Regions:
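Membrane-interface amphipathic segments in extracytoplasmic regions
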Residues: 1-262
């Protein structure tokens, strides 16, 4: 599986001229990369693709497994200073780690990831998104800006397609822009769709202790995970023009990681 994923990726990179050999690692990308030295592991964080659980896993790898994954709060895992970003090291070390460590990134169907981001960030009450971002969206699309009605999926999509891809929030920025897989040669290209298999493969590759399992914790446990059916329900709210525009926005993600726009 890995070989075919890597082959597809490499040929799409070439065909679309996405390789920038010899250029300096983009600091935005270095910010998305987490380093775990004990097992020489680098993980690229793609939000909405099981990243909280990968961060929990890195935390456990570092801490000799003396805690349970379920004890690590969602909020804490994203604000801990114990998990180091590649960006916090000088460029020479960044290079060294990138050449010697096992590098991993996970992807998810672009439409499913988009719906998951909308459900998680705009339908829940995380103040930055449900207030700040939501108000920015309301201001763009509503005549009556005082209305406190939740931002609709259509408004959310219009908001995203109105911006340049590079400037998008990491929760909905195209995955290839977050992790630069054409220049960083990931050793494992995992998929959310085959998360169990792929995470076992990663843990074996980095020689993790056998007792460590990738956790399947979920932040809002009462809700269904965003799956294909839920994604379709949301996509049906969009016009064909909007769908064409999000296809275009995530076009490289579809090609590089071999997802179909079904």
């Amino acid at each position: 599986i890995q070989n075919s994923r890597k082959t597809t990726l490499a040929s799409v990179c070439l065909k679309n001229n996405l390789n920038k050999p010899g250029s300096k690692l983009d600091s935005h990308v270095a910010y998305q990369l987490f380093v775990e030295h004990k097992h020489k592991f680098i993980y690229c964080e793609v939000p909405k693709v099981g990243c909280s659980n990968w961060k929990r896993t890195i935390f456990l790898l570092q801490s000799n497994l003396n805690t349970e994954a379920s004890e690590i709060e969602h909020v804490n895992i994203h604000h801990t200073t114990l998990i180091k970003r590649l960006l916090s090291y000088p460029p020479a070390l960044q290079k060294e780690f990138l050449s010697n460590y096992t590098k991993v990134m996970f992807t998810r169907h672009p439409f499913e990831r988009l719906v998951s981001a909308y459900r998680d960030k705009l339908l829940h009450s995380e103040p930055f998104y449900s207030t700040t971002v939501a108000n920015e969206i309301r201001a763009m699309f509503r005549k009556n800006t005082n209305s406190s009605e939740k931002v609709s999926f259509q408004e959310f999509v219009n908001f995203i397609i109105a911006k340049p891809p590079h400037s998008l929030d990491i929760h909905w920025k195209p995955m290839f822009l977050l992790c630069d897989p054409c220049d960083i040669h990931y050793d494992v290209l995992g998929k959310y769709e085959t998360l169990g298999l792929d995470s076992d493969h990663v843990l074996k590759a980095i020689d993790a202790p056998e007792s460590l399992q990738y956790p399947s914790l979920k932040r809002y446990s009462s809700e269904k995970r965003t799956d294909g059916d839920i994604t379709l329900e949301y996509l049906r709210q969009l016009t064909s023009k909007q769908i064409e525009k999000i296809k275009k926005l995530y076009e490289m993600d579809f090609f590089l990681f071999n997802y179909t726009t079904k």
